[in-house]
Every structure is written in structure tokens, then in C-alpha cells.
Amino acid sequence: MQKNLLWFVLSFLPALAFAQSPFDGTWKTNMTASKLSQKPYEFSLNNGTYSCGSCVPKMENVKADGHDQNVAAPGRDYDTLAVKIVDDHSARFTGKKAGKPVYEQTRSTSRDGSTLTIASMNYPADGSQAFKTEVKFTRVGKAPAGANATSGSWRIQNVSEDEAGLTSTWKRSGDNLSMSTPTGVSWEAKLDGKEYPVKGSSYDKYTVSVKSLGDRSIEATYRRDGKVATVEKITVSADGKQMTIVADNKLLGRISTFIDDKQ
């Protein structure tokens, strides 16, 4: 009887010892269920120049002549920007880093100027898979008289994105946690609150520090050049099917909640 009981107990030890953490696996962001910050974005394309009041750092009076203009600044992921006006309701943007495209973007409004669509192709710096995004906005502030219709104050409504830009893979082993994406962003960190490098794409100047908030919750703090950029509270549901990420972007002053589904 005792041997049978011992065998019964020992038979469960491998499963317990090697049980997956709630974070383990591949996750995909459900943009329909996510709640994005409603703080407005501000753009101006007027008198042959482009300005972005909501950008960090801010961008002012960039020539909109279709040629690469120097916009290098600490904290900016591209060093040149080319802005080309297509017509009264649309414009094209190309951001580059060291001559290589970071993104190519088209901005266009509805004929009545009430909605804005920004469609982008994004190119990771390490050559990882490029991916598309499309963001739709609703106007909350008028464009100045004579300005391109893409100007004004805009509130984000929804985002659609290629799977590569929405997917991440997580793995926890003891006090070690790793995250990677198809677009080349990855990190490995201990749950000790110390800073570890973020690799890939434009995140070469970023670090991440991670601490546990419980069996199903962690806090990840991203820093750029030593300054806190974003703090994320990440929690996996009790059934293990959903991961909620509350992202507090300290640089932009925006708080968004992302819902990821287990794949």
C-alpha cells in the first residue's frame, strides 16, 4: 500500500517540476478587444512644411518637398524624413535611418475631412519581417485655414496590423523570462528588477527590467538611454487563455490596454 502510494505521488513530480508558466507560449494581440489611449494626436501640413506636436521629440517645420530632410534627434528612431504632398487630402511620408527605410506611410482623409487613415509599411532594422499597419482616426480639432486636410487634432479609433506585428512568444523558466517577436524584437531577463538589453529593430538603446507581481502577473519597465519610456503590467487570466497588458507610455503620456489571446 505504501509503495503504491509512493508511486502515485512520484508519478506527478515530473509534471509538477516541468509545468509551464502561465506566460509560456505564443500570443496575438486582439485589437478589437484592446482599448487605446484617447489622447489626441496633432499634425500640421501647411505652407509647405510639416510639424508634429504630439511626437516625442516634437517635430517642427520640416520641408514637405518630397526630399529627405534631417530630423535626427535623441529618442527618434529615424534620422531623415521625406514628406510629399499628394493632393489636398493626402500625403506620403518616408522615414529613414542611415539611408535605410524605417517606414513608408500614406496619410489620407475622407472627402469631408472628418476621418484620417494612416497606412504604413514598417521595416525592422535587423532585416526581420516587414509588416503593415493601418490606423484610423476621427477628427477632434480643425485644420488651419489653407492647410492640408491631414492637419489638425485626431483621436485614434482602431488599428489593424499584419500578424507579424501582433504576435509575441514568451517563455519563463524559474526566475528567467524571455520575449520575442517575428519582427526581430527580443529580450531575456531575470525577475530581479535589474536592466537587461532589448535586441532588434530600433530598440538598440532600450533596456527592460522585470519583476514578479504574483504567479500570473509581472511588471516590465522599458528604458531608453536610461530614461523610463514605458511601464507595462502584464497579467494572464486564470484559464490561461488571455493576457492583459496595461501599457503606460511615459514619453507620450498615453495609457493603453492590450488584450492578447493564446494561440
Give the positions of each predicted feature.
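Bacterial N-terminal signal peptides
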Residues: 7-16
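Hydrophobic small-molecule pocket/channel-lining residues, especially in calycin-type beta-barrels
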Residues: 20-263
